[in-house]
Amino acid sequence: MTSPIHVMSEIGKLKTVMLKRPNVEVENFTPDMMERLLFDDIPYLPIAQQEHDNFAETLRQNGTEVLYLEQLSAEALDDGGEEVKLNFLEQMLAESGYVAGVTHDALKEYLLSLDTQAMVNKIMGGVRKNELDFVPADLVSAAEEDDYPFFMDPMPNLYFTRDPAASIGDGLSINHMTFAARQRESLFMETIIKYHHRFANKGLNVWRDRNHDTRIEGGDELVLSDHVLAIGVSQRTSADAIEDIARNLFAKSHFDKVIAIKIPHNHAMMHLDTVFTMINTDQFTVHPGILGEGGHIDTWTITPGKDGQLSLDHQTDLKKVLKDALNLDDLDLIPTGNGDPIIAGREQWNDGSNTLAIAPGVVVTYNRNYVSNELLRKHGLKVIDVLSSELSRGRGGPRCMSMPLVREDL
């Protein structure tokens, strides 16, 4: 039986991917809500959708099957039946702050009045207070911010499908995300894996589920080979979560090495894949801003120890660590912005390091990062650049916007 999830590298030919087309959620908020929702700007939706459609069509033209999170979610709920749909809605309401009470009941009645796809779209897009024809009479509602316009916040980060879950081998992690604005997102993926006919009862391994206090996000999880992962110790992924998933992988899979890479804990470099990506068997992009004197950075190579314990080896020479882990004689670390501190900073901010490999040496990038793109071409890469003026306002690039489900083995 062919597994519906099969990812043994960052660079194997991309056969199936999951995207989320930007919808009302990316403009259904005001500037004073941006910090709460982890956004820096409000995209112009019609152009963002055109750009995303261009991205999806680029993938299709290169032989990739494109699936959509919003459609899979609705199909999974329909596949699961009425009880699954009710349980999903109760969990979503609880994670939105409504376990019981009149507001809970009104939201539940309203959302269940919609067909399944419309319900999913509404949850993703946010439920405003003026959409429900009732006056809250419970203490919870009375004590809330009277002028806040939403009962349920929109989820504008959903088009970054990379983060709520991560495909690893013939399984995945379903992630407990760091900030409240994104924590509900992984409930969609949990539902898809459990109930969608494409994934349910197919023997998929869940290496780590979303029911943890420690946090991890898919932008920090890179599958370097069928034995080696790199995971960022970042603003969004904690060291204890990395140890947890390493233990699970070592016990139940063929993965036997995890390289933890510590990066600056800030919004511009929120995930490892915003500063470091694998693009060929021996080529990587790297943002110079994460490297210290002599090109050093803190890494810990984690391997199985005795009696289920972990063995850690701390090193600071990233190039040597990668060569040793991947059995390479040499490798090519290609600096974002050609190493120029101004260009590198600007292009990293606009996801110049966030490349998506769709085959060995073939990458999809944002067209706005023209210095980095030209440098990749000079290093022998085939670069397919896509439109990016509005999509980039969300602070995520082609890798962020895609969750590979199936890649060919190398």
UniProtKB/Swiss-Prot annotation:
InterPro entries: Arg_deiminase (IPR003876)
Compartment(s): Cytoplasm
Active-site residues annotated for this sequence: 400
GO cellular component: cytoplasm
The UniProt record lists the keyword Hydrolase: yes
Source organism, top-level taxon: Bacteria
GO terms (BP aspect): arginine catabolic process to ornithine; arginine deiminase pathway
EC numbers, comma separated: 3.5.3.6
Gene Ontology MF, one: arginine deiminase activity
Pfam families membership: ADI
Keyword rRNA processing: no
Alphabetized UniProt keyword annotations: Arginine metabolism, Cytoplasm, Hydrolase
Predominant cellular place of this UniProt entry's protein: cytoplasm
The reaction(s) this protein catalyses: L-arginine + H2O = L-citrulline + NH4(+)
Pathway: Amino-acid degradation; L-arginine degradation via ADI pathway; carbamoyl phosphate from L-arginine: step 1/2
Family of this protein: Belongs to the arginine deiminase family.
Name by which UniProt lists this protein: Arginine deiminase
Source species of the chain: Levilactobacillus brevis (strain ATCC 367 / BCRC 12310 / CIP 105137 / JCM 1170 / LMG 11437 / NCIMB 947 / NCTC 947) (Lactobacillus brevis)
